[in-house]
C-alpha cells in the first residue's frame, strides 16, 4: 500500500470515529399529534385505557422478571377517566363547575393522550407498580401517595450517585424518554462517548506512527536506491559501461539520419549513408554500452585465440582463418564523434548514444521518444534492434540462487564470464543444438582440451546436432564428430529440474540422468526485439515475428527496418526473417542506400557459415531446412586430407579415391529416432566434401556447401534461376567437389 493510501485510510477511520463519538443514541422520537382532535367518545376512551393498562402491566412484569432486584424509573400514563366518569368524579370531589368546563375546552384543543409523553410519573419498585395497576382507577391517588411516601426513586438516585453514575432526569424519566432501566442510563452514553473519543485518539496516534514509520522506510529505501544507482554508475564507469553522454539532454534535438540499434545492420547502414552522402550526420542510439561490434567470433574465433596469461583480450582481437588478426569492433573509439559535437561537425560523421533505449517512434511526425521522455526528430530513420536470446521458462522462473548459475550467450560480457569459468576448470552445460549451441560446445571442448579444463555437456531434445539444418544422416555424423572432440552430447533429453547446492547445480533430466554442473548456458535461439511495434503502431508478422516491411525494407514512409528484426518478402522463397550475419550486412547496406534516395528492392539471397571444430565447416544459402527433401553429393577425402581454409579455396587437393553418393531425405526421415550415437569414425560414414541441395516443388531453394568454400556465388546463381534439374549430379559437378 502506498503512503497516500495509508493516509487516506487513517483520515477516514478518524472521521468515522468522531461521528460515532458525537452521535446521541436517542429513543423513539415522540410524534406530536395534530393540534386539534375530534372529542373522544366514551367507548374509545375506555378501550384505550384498557389497552394502555394491559400494555403497562405486561411491560412491568417483563421488567420485573428481567431485573427482579432493581428499582426502575417507570413512566406511568395518565389514568384520566372518560368524560362521563370525569364529571362524576368532579362532582364527588367537589370540584367547581368552571374547572370542568375548562378541562373540556382543553380536551378539545389538545388530545387527551400523547404518545411518548407522560402526565403523571411515579417512581416505584416493580411490585408497587403491579399493585398500583391492579387497584381501581378511583384508588389511584392513594397508591401514588404511598409511592411518594416510600420515595424509592430518591433511594434509587442516591444509589446511582454512590456508584458514580449520573442520576436520572429531574422528572424521573430514563434517558431518551424510555421506560427506564440501568442499561439505558445516560452514564452509559457518556461512557460510550468517552470510549469512542479515546479510540479515536488512539487511532490518530497509531495512524500517525504508522505514517511516520512507512515514510521513514520509504525515505530509507529511496536513499538506498539512490546510493545503489550511484554505485552502479561508478561500476559501469570503471568497467567502461557508463552511458554516453551522461544525460539524454546532451543529445541533439534533430538529426538528418537516425539509427535505432548498434549492431551489424546499423553500422552497415551508416557506411552506406556515408558513401552516398559525404557530409551525413548520423546518430546511432544503442541500449548497449559498447561501440558496434560483430557477433560471430564470440562463439568461434575468439576461443581459438592463444591467451597464455588468461587476461582480458584487448579489443577482443582474434585470428581469422587466413592468419590475419582483427578486432571484434568494426572501428576504434576514435572513429566516432561525441553526440554533443555532432551538430557542430561540418564534415558529418557518426555519433553513438550508448546505454539509451527508444520506446516509441512517431512515423507521421518523424519523432522518436526515449525511455526518459526525451524526443528527437529525424528526416530518415532505421530500426535495427536485432533480437534477444531466449531462455527456458523453467530456468527463467527459477530461484535467485539457481539464476546465479544460469546465463545466455550474446555479448562480449557473456564471453568474458564464460571464459573465466572455463579457465577455472568448471564444468559447463550447454542447452541447445543450434548454431550458437553447437559452435560454442566445440569451442569450449577445444579450450578445455588445450587447458586441461572441466567437462562440457550439451543437452537438447532433438536426435542430433544441427538437426533443423542438416539431413538426418549428416546430423548424426556431426554429433559423432563433436563427441570425438570431447563434447559429452546428451540427445533426446531436457532439463526437468535444477537445484542449487553449495557450489554446483544439480540438473535432473527427463531421461533419468543427473548432471552436476557449475554453470548452464542456454542457447535455444532468439526472438526479434519488436517492443517498439505497439507504441509506434507498426505491423509485426504473427508467424515469423519481426517488423513487416516492403521490398525496399520500408515499414512506413521514411522509416526502414533491417537485420534480424525485419520480416521481408523474398520473390523466390516468400516472406522470410533471417538471423545471419550476412543478411544483417546486406539488408543494412540496402536500407542505408534507400535512406539516401536509392529506393532499391531487396533481392539478395543471404548466406551463412558455421565451424564445428577443425574438421567441419560449411556454408549455406537460401532456404536450408532439414524438413525439405534433400539430395547430397559427397567426395570421400584421403587420409592425408586436411581442413580447407574458410576464406580460401584449395585447388591442389589430392583426392585419389572419390565416391559420389546421392541421398534424398524427407521430413519423416529427418525426424527418425537415434538411440545412440557412436563416436568411432570407423563405424560412421565419412563425409569429406560435398554439396547438399534442398528441394521444394522439384526446384532448388537452398544449397549447403560441406567443407567447400568460396563457391557461394555459384550457389546463389543456381537458386536465382528457379528451375528444375533432371540430374543433380551434373549440377554438383559445377562445384568441383573432387578438385
Swiss-Prot record:
FAD binds at residues 261-265, 295, 300, 358, 410, 564, 580-581. GO terms for molecular function: DNA binding; FAD binding; NAD(P)H oxidase H2O2-forming activity; NADH dehydrogenase activity; protein dimerization activity. Residues 644-681 are annotated as: Disordered. Its cofactor is FAD. Disruption phenotype: Loss of zygotic expression results in decreased embryonic cell death and the persistence of differentiated neuronal cells along the ventral nerve cord at late embryonic stages. Embryos that do hatch undergo growth arrest at early larval stages, accompanied by mitochondrial respiratory dysfunction. InterPro entries: AIF_C, FAD-oxidoreductase/Apoptosis, FAD/NAD-bd_sf, FAD/NAD-binding_dom, FAD/NAD-linked_Rdtase_dimer_sf. Signal peptide: none annotated. Keywords: Apoptosis, FAD, Flavoprotein, Mitochondrion, NAD, Oxidoreductase, Transit peptide. One of its GO terms (cellular component) is cytoplasm. Residues 656-676 have a biased composition (Low complexity). It comes from the Eukaryota. SUPFAM superfamilies: FAD/NAD(P)-binding domain, FAD/NAD-linked reductases, dimerisation (C-terminal) domain. Probable NADH oxidoreductase. Mitochondrial effector of cell death that plays roles in developmentally regulated cell death and normal mitochondrial function. This is Putative apoptosis-inducing factor 1, mitochondrial. It comes from Drosophila melanogaster. The gene is AIF.
Amino acid at each position: 500500500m502506498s503512503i497516500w493510501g495509508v493516509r487516506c485510510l487513517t483520515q477516514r477511520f478518524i472521521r468515522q470515529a468522531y461521528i460515532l463519538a458525537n452521535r446521541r443514541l436517542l429513543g423513539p422520537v415522540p410524534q406530536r399529534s395534530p393540534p386539534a382532535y375530534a372529542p373522544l367518545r366514551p367507548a374509545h376512551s375506555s378501550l384505550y385505557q384498557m389497552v394502555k393498562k394491559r400494555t403497562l402491566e405486561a411491560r412491568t412484569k417483563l421488567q420485573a422478571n428481567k431485573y427482579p432486584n432493581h428499582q426502575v424509573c417507570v413512566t406511568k400514563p395518565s389514568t384520566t377517566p372518560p368524560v362521563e366518569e370525569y364529571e362524576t368524579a368532579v362532582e364527588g370531589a367537589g370540584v367547581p363547575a368552571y374547572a370542568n368546563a375548562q378541562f373540556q375546552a382543553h380536551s378539545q384543543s389538545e388530545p387527551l393522550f400523547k404518545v411518548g409523553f407522560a402526565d403523571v410519573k411515579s417512581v416505584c419498585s416493580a411490585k408497587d407498580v403491579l399493585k398500583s395497576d391492579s387497584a381501581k382507577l378511583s384508588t389511584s391517588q392513594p397508591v401514588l401517595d404511598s409511592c411518594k411516601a416510600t420515595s424509592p426513586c430518591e433511594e434509587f438516585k442516591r444509589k446511582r450517585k454512590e456508584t458514580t453514575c449520573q442520576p436520572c432526569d429531574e422528572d424521573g424519566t430514563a434517558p431518551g424518554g424510555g421506560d427506564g432501566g440501568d442499561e439505558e442510563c445516560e452514564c452509559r452514553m457518556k461512557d460510550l462517548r468517552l470510549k469512542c473519543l479515546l479510540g479515536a485518539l488512539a487511532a490518530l496516534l497509531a495512524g500517525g506512527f504508522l505514517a511516520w514509520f512507512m515514510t521513514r522506510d520509504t525515505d530509507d529505501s529511496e536513499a538506498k536506491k539512490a546510493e545503489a544507482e550511484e554505485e552502479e554508475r561508478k561500476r559501469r564507469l570503471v568497467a567502461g559501461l557508463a552511458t554516453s553522454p551522461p544525460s539524454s539532454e546532451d543529445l541533439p534535438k534533430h538529426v538528418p539520419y537516425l539509427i535505432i540499434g548498434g549492431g551489424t545492420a546499423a553500422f552497415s547502414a551508416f557506411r552506406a549513408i556515408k558513401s552516398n552522402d559525404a557530409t551525413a550526420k548520423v546518430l546511432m542510439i544503442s541500449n548497449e554500452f559498447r561501440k558496434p561490434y560483430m557477433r560471430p567470433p564470440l562463439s568461434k574465433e575468439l576461443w581459438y585465440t592463444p591467451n597464455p596469461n588468461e587476461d582480458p583480450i584487448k579489443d577482443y582481437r582474434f585470428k581469422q582463418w587466413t592468419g590475419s588478426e582483427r578486432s571484434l569492433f568494426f572501428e576504434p573509439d576514435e572513429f566516432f564523434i561525441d553526440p554533443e559535437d555532432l551538430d557542430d561537425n561540418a564534415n558529418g560523421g557518426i555519433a553513438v548514444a550508448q546505454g539509451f533505449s527508444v520506446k516509441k517512434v512517431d512515423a507521421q511526425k518523424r519523432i522518436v521518444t526515449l525511455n526518459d521522455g526525451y524526443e528527437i526528430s529525424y528526416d530518415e530513420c532505421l530500426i535495427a534492434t536485432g533480437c534477444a536470446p531466449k531462455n527456458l521458462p523453467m530456468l527463467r522462473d527459477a530461484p535467485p540462487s539457481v539464476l546465479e548459475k544460469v546465463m545466455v550467450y550474446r555479448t562480449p560480457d557473456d564471453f568474458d564470464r564464460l571464459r573465466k569459468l572455463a579457465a577455472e576448470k568448471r564444468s559447463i552445460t550447454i542447452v541447445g543444438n543450434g548454431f550458437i549451441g553447437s559452435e560454442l560446445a566445440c569451442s569450449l571442448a577445444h579450450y578445455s582440451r588445450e587447458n586441461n579444463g572441466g567437462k562440457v555437456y550439451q543437452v537438447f531434445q532433438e536426435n542430433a546436432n544441427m538437426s533443423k539444418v542438416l539431413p538426418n544422416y549428416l546430423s548424426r555424423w556431426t554429433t559423432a564428430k563433436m563427441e570425438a572432440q570431447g563434447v559429452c552430447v546428451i540427445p533426446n533429453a531436457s532439463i526437468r529440474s535444477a537445484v542449487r547446492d553449495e557450489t554446483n547445480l544439480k540438473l535432473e533430466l527427463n531421461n533419468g540422468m543427473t548432471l552436476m554442473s557449475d554453470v548452464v548456458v542456454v542457447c535455444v535461439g532468439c526472438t526479434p526485439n519488436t517492443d517498439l511495434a505497439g507504441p509506434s503502431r507498426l505491423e509485426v508478422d504473427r508467424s515469423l515475428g519481426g517488423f513487416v516491411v516492403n521490398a525496399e525494407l520500408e515499414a512506413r514512409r521514411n522509416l526502414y527496418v533491417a537485420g534480424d528484426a525485419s520480416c521481408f518478402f523474398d520473390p523466390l522463397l516468400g516472406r522470410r526473417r533471417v538471423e545471419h550475419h550476412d543478411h544483417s550486412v546486406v539488408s543494412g547496406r540496402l536500407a542505408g542506400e534507400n535512406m539516401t534516395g536509392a529506393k532499391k528492392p531487396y533481392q539478395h539471397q543471404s548466406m551463412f557459415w558455421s565451424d564445428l571444430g577443425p574438421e567441419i565447416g560449411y556454408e549455406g544459402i537460401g532456404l536450408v531446412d532439414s524438413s525439405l527433401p534433400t539430395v547430397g553429393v559427397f567426395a570421400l577425402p584421403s587420409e592425408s586430407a586436411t581442413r580447407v581454409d574458410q576464406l580460401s579455396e584449395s585447388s591442389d587437393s589430392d583426392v585419389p579415391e572419390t565416391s559420389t553418393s546421392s541421398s534424398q531425405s524427407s521430413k519423416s526421415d529427418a525426424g527418425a529416432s537415434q538411440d545412440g550415437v557412436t563416436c568411432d569414425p570407423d563405424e560412421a560414414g565419412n563425409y569429406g566434401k560435398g554439396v547438399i541441395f534442398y528441394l521444394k516443388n522439384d526446384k532448388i531453394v537452398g544449397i549447403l556447401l560441406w567443407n567447400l568454400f568460396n563457391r557461394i556465388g555459384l550457389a546463389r546463381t543456381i537458386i536465382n534461376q528457379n528451375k528444375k534439374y533432371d540430374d543433380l549430379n551434373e549440377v554438383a559437378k559445377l562445384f568441383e567437389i573432387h578438385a
